[in-house]
Design a protein with these regions (language model features):
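Extracellular glycan-recognition regions
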Residues: 1-99
Length: 99
């Protein structure tokens, strides 16, 4: 699973992709078009849930999906530009932590 903000046709979207034999992409209008966005992933038994927030307090669920209970969850950051000339990215005040 990967989750984050995606720029599609000039608009920012909250994006979650699950891959288990095939990929399943879910999007919704991002919680903030210009400001900071917090992401949280919650694991419960054999599923994970991707949530985002514009204030780090109130989170909205974007997608929940199957994730085998015996598989370790790993987290990291990335940027990608599958089309065009690319872009500059800045991660500011980045924190990765477990609950």
């Amino acid at each position: 699973m990967k989750c984050g903000s995606e720029l599609v046709e000039g608009k920012r979207w909250a994006s979650v992709v699950f891959t288990h034999d095939y990929s399943d992409w879910s999007t919704m209008e991002d919680v903030s078009q210009t400001g900071a966005v917090w992401w949280r992933v919650v694991r419960t038994k054999d599923s994970i849930e991707a949530q985002c927030s514009k204030d780090g307090e109130k989170f909205t669920t974007i997608r929940q999906g199957y994730f085998p209970a015996d598989v370790k969850v790993m987290a990291g950051v990335m940027c990608a530009a599958p089309e065009g000339a690319g872009f500059d990215a800045k991660f500011d005040q980045l924190t990765l932590k477990t609950a």
